[in-house]
Structure formats: C-alpha cells, structure tokens
C-alpha cells in the first residue's frame, strides 16, 4: 500500500499499470476498504492506470474525529493527485457511489467519466438521509483472536456468494490488531452525523463528464 496525507490523515491506496494509460479509481462501499477491489488490479493493469483506496476511517487509512461527505471527497482527490491521475474515470459502489457523485460535482471538468454501481440518484422529494435515524456509535468490539472475528464477517444484506475465496480474502483484510485484541478496520463513528444531502439529482444534471449506471444482475437491493 501507498499513503498520502489529506487534512492530517494518512489515506491508503494501491495502484497498477502505466500512469500514461487512462486512469481509473474505484471507490468502495460502507465499512469496506481497498482490498475489496484489489484482485481486479492485475486484470486491468495492461490497459489502465488502476487505483483503489480506503476512505478515512476505513481499511488501512487513519481515523478522524468527525466526517462529512466533503471529507471523503477530499480523500479521493488527494489520492488522485498523489497518484498522478489525469482525467480519471471514477467508479463508485454503493456508499462509494455517493462519494463519487459528490466528487464529480466538484471535479467533473477534470474527469473522463463517472460510473455509479448499485447506487440510485433520487429526486429531492424522494430523498432519505441514510444515517438520520442512526444512534451514536459504540466503541469498537474487541475480541481475543483474529479467527473469532473473521467468523463474524457477513455480507450486507445477507446473500449467497459463489466466490467464497474472495469473501475469505476480504474478511482477512478487514481486521486490525489492537493493544487488547482484534477489531474491524472501520471506525464505528464514521457515520455519526453524516449528511449525504438531497442535491444528488441536481448534481447529476450539471455534471460535465459522461455518466453510467450499473446494477448487479443478482442484487437483492434493486429491482430491474
């Protein structure tokens, strides 16, 4: 992993391929991290300058005392600049879709495209704040050994996966050792007070780069 400091926090990222090729950066979902997409890097490295990253408060990146949607945007653009990515295509999955859309609202003139994966842009009247009903986060759960924590790892929402080896790999890289045991890599307080905003449809209509939407064929979150 490489790291770049953004507003006092070290942000983790990984990159593959020739920086002279089209740049693509992939943004993960809630409580995820760069390793969710690491296995794709080698597949795309011959044609693209491919980058994955972990938002602050997740993966190998530092935690912060408070987070806003602009916090994550700054994380992304800090990585883009540090990796020397020119006119990148940004691919955002779920929560990463929200972050990528807000990133595009500020930087679409410097982007080659935006791909939103399993993310819906709602009209203002249909907007729902994801974290409005969230109770303040409790301290991270600590367990004695890594294996017990990995056994608790689940996909959300629950679903079958034909590539269990990928789930096992992700679970293994979703833990961190503390002074008293093992815990997940994400900051439980990352979403306390986080406002995603009701301006997504307005942002979408004003973007200056091509936009694509992708939904998993077997997703349980969305209907065709």
Residue ranges and their predicted role:
Residues 4-14, 39, 51-91:
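Active-site loop/oxyanion-hole signature of alpha/beta-hydrolase fold enzymes
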Residues 25-29, 215:
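The conserved beta1-alpha1 loop
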Residues 92, 96, 100:
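Gly/Ala-rich beta-loop-alpha elbow adjacent to hydrolase catalytic centers
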Residues 31, 55-59, 121:
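Alpha/beta-hydrolase active-site loop signature
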Residues 101-105, 112-146:
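Flexible "cap/lid" loop of the alpha/beta hydrolase fold
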Residues 20, 29-32, 94:
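Active-site glycine-rich loops that stabilize anionic/oxyanionic intermediates
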Residues 29-39, 50:
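Serine-hydrolase catalytic-loop signature spanning alpha/beta hydrolases and amidase-signature enzymes
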Residues 175-224:
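Conserved serine/cysteine hydrolase catalytic core
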């Amino acid at each position: 992993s490489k790291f770049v400091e953004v507003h006092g926090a070290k942000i983790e990222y990984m990159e593959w391929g020739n920086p002279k090729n089209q740049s693509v950066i992939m943004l993960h979902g809630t409580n995820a991290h760069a390793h969710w997409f690491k296995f794709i890097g080698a597949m795309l490295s011959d044609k693209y300058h491919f980058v994955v990253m972990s938002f602050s408060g997740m993966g190998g990146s530092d935690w912060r005392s408070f987070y806003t949607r602009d916090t994550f945007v700054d994380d992304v653009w800090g990585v883009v600049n540090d990796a020397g990515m020119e006119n990148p295509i940004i691919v955002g999955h779920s929560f990463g879709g929200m972050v990528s859309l807000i990133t595009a609202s500020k930087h679409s003139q410097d982007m080659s495209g935006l791909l939103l994966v399993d993310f819906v842009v709602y009209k203002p009247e249909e907007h729902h704040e994801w974290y409005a009903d969230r109770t303040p986060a409790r301290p991270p759960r600590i367990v004695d050994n890594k294996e017990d924590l990995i056994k608790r790892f689940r996909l959300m929402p629950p679903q079958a996966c034909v590539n269990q080896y990928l789930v096992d790999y992700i679970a293994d890289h979703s833990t961190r050792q503390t002074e008293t045991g093992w815990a997940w890599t994400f900051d439980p307080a990352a979403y306390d007070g986080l406002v995603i905003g009701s301006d997504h449809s307005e942002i979408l209509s004003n973007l200056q780069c091509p936009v694509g939407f992708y939904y998993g064929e077997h997703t349980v979150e969305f209907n065709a």
